[in-house]
Amino acid sequence: MTASSSGCGGLPVSQCPSYSSLSKLFFMDSSYDSYYCEEPEERQTASIRERKRMCSINVAFIELRNYIPTFPYEKRLSKIDTLNLAIAYINMLDDVLRTPEDSGQYIQKCVHMARTGQIGAPAWSTSDLLARLNWIKWRRLGIEPIA
């Protein structure tokens, strides 16, 4: 197939709509030696799929934000902040489950190590998570506040 061959619903590529912006519409065929213009229906279907995909990703981020500690004044965390906080929070919860120590004492020890710059503090204790943990109303949860 050449640039003048059919590829746009039977039309020659040179007569495809938006010929001036073909770089956005061209895709290589399986032989990688010729180009064709994508059908409008296929493009529309692909756009719908992409919108659905982005919508499901956004819904997943909204759900994830419900499970990580946030500041009361924050409207919404960015996606990267959400992921970083989720990773730190999961690591903290994993450490709490694995330690033979009392959970509250273990967290207080880790927080103290991080605040005093001691080597050996868990990676999650140096993250933004510590600042957020200070906003939690621990007494309402029946837990002594983290010092």
Swiss-Prot record:
Could you tell me the keywords of this UniProt record?
Cytoplasm, Developmental protein, Differentiation, DNA-binding, Nucleus, Transcription, Transcription regulation
Query: InterPro entries, alphabetically?
Result: bHLH_dom, E-box_TF_Regulators, HLH_DNA-bd_sf
In terms of superkingdom, the source organism counts as: Eukaryota
Pfam families reported in the protein's UniProt record = HLH
Species of the source? Caenorhabditis elegans
Compartments where found: Nucleus; Cytoplasm
Q: Cellular component per GO?
A: cytoplasm; nucleus
Q: What tissues express this gene product?
A: Expressed in hermaphrodite dopaminergic neurons (ADE, CEP, and PDE).
Its chief place of residence is nucleus
The Gene Ontology biological process terms listed for this entry are: cell differentiation; dauer exit; developmental process; regulation of transcription by RNA polymerase II; response to oxidative stress
- Report the leader peptide range: none
The record's function comment reads: Transcriptional activator. Shown to have a role in the negative regulation of exit from L1 arrest and dauer diapause dependent on IIS signaling (insulin and insulin-like growth factor (IGF) signaling). Hypodermal expression is regulated by IIS/daf-16 while neuronal expression is not under the control of IIS/daf-16.
Q: What induces it?
A: Induced by daf-16.
**Residues in bHLH domain copies:** 41-93
- Point out the gene that encodes the protein: hlh-13
What start-end ranges are recorded for coiled-coil regions in this protein?
Answer: none
Q: Which GO molecular-function terms appear in the entry?
A: DNA-binding transcription factor activity, RNA polymerase II-specific; DNA-binding transcription factor binding; protein dimerization activity; RNA polymerase II transcription regulatory region sequence-specific DNA binding
Q: What is the name attached to this protein's record? A: Helix-loop-helix protein 13
What follows loss of this gene? Faster exit from L1 arrest and IIS-dependent dauer diapause.
